């Protein structure tokens, strides 16, 4: 049994935020796939410490091309992060965040967006506080009709997790979101269940079977319907530079992805989605993504 002396701090166990509950299982389903898209991501960093991120994608079905540009500068001495964003919808965004300065574990963020074409403006203040066994969050969306308040809390103890998430619309004076979640996690196993607004029920299981193989199961059901959604996914690391991912759901949609690191900072991902119910009818999707980082 481990013991902790006066000069040896007990290891911290900070639970994830509510949005990150079940994230390990979702990542197996989502990462390594990009059906119907041709995508390019580029990340660079200047000598002065400014980070540049650009992303562009083309939808193979509609032909629509979208892109984003983001610049980020971290002033580590004061715990400040400045972020500027732009996208092809001509929406400009500015974000200022300060972390671990007012008190340890507290992060405050001021986020604004502006669309010159429509004149639409929005503002949001985000706050999060995380310490051992607790992770709290509170965001305020400012609107002319009245602000909306988003709150969340996750508590953890010896691997067990319990969370609550809500949204209060001050314009309507009522709760518009009321979610609960319970989970359990260890180093190679995670279980997550959730209830959204008393009508949507979901659960997921993540397990690291061995060093190279990760698996995930996802289940969802909405009350008042006979529709149950079920999926299985897996990721296998072929070697240090290549991995293959596969997933299938109860709608007979089969997805396969292959990721290869061509050289340090260059990663290629190929993916395909096949409709198992109509293999000969067409409608299948392919995807290609290239990530560059320097």
UniProtKB/Swiss-Prot annotation:
A GO cellular-component term linked to this record: sperm midpiece
Reaction(s) catalysed (UniProt annotation): chloride(in) = chloride(out); K(+)(in) = K(+)(out); a 1,2-diacyl-sn-glycero-3-phospho-L-serine(in) = a 1,2-diacyl-sn-glycero-3-phospho-L-serine(out); a 1,2-diacyl-sn-glycero-3-phosphocholine(in) = a 1,2-diacyl-sn-glycero-3-phosphocholine(out)
Superkingdom classification of source: Eukaryota
General function of this protein: Non-selective voltage-gated ion channel that mediates the transport of anions and cations through the mitochondrion outer membrane and plasma membrane. The channel adopts an open conformation at zero mV and a closed conformation at both positive and negative potentials. There are two populations of channels; the main that functions in a lower open-state conductance with lower ion selectivity, that switch, in a voltage-dependent manner, from the open to a low-conducting 'closed' state and the other that has a normal ion selectivity in the typical high conductance, 'open' state. Catalyzes the scrambling of phospholipids across the outer mitochondrial membrane; the mechanism is unrelated to channel activity and is capable of translocating both anionic and zwitterionic phospholipids.
Protein keywords: Acetylation, ATP-binding, Ion transport, Isopeptide bond, Lipid transport, Lipid-binding, Membrane, Mitochondrion, Mitochondrion outer membrane, NAD, Nucleotide-binding, Phosphoprotein, Porin, Transmembrane, Transmembrane beta strand, Transport, Ubl conjugation
Record organism: Bos taurus
Modified residues (Phosphotyrosine): 78
Quaternary structure, from the entry: Monomer, homodimer and higher order oligomers; formation of higher order structures is necessary for scramblase activity. Interacts with ARMC12 in a TBC1D21-dependent manner. Interacts with KLC3. Interacts with SPATA33. Interacts with PPP3CC in a SPATA33-dependent manner.
Binding site for NAD(+): 253-255, 271-275
Post-translational modification: Ubiquitinated by PRKN during mitophagy, leading to its degradation and enhancement of mitophagy. Deubiquitinated by USP30.
Molecular function terms from GO: ATP binding; ceramide binding; cholesterol binding; oxysterol binding; phosphatidylcholine binding; porin activity; voltage-gated monoatomic anion channel activity; voltage-gated monoatomic ion channel activity
Gene name as annotated: VDAC2
Site entry (Involved in ceramide and phosphatidylcholine binding), positions: 85
Coiled coil feature spans: none
Record PTM N-acetylalanine, positions in chain: 2
GO BP, one annotated term: lipid transport
Cross-link (Glycyl lysine isopeptide (Lys-Gly) (interchain with G-Cter in ubiquitin)): 31, 64, 120-121, 172, 277
Phosphoserine: residues bearing it: 251
Residues with the Phosphothreonine modification: 118
Residues reported to bind ATP: 23, 31
Assigned protein family: Belongs to the eukaryotic mitochondrial porin family.
Comment on protein domains: Consists mainly of a membrane-spanning beta-barrel formed by 19 beta-strands.
Residues recorded with modification N6-acetyllysine: 31, 120, 277
Compartment list: Mitochondrion outer membrane; Membrane
Protein name, as recorded: Non-selective voltage-gated ion channel VDAC2
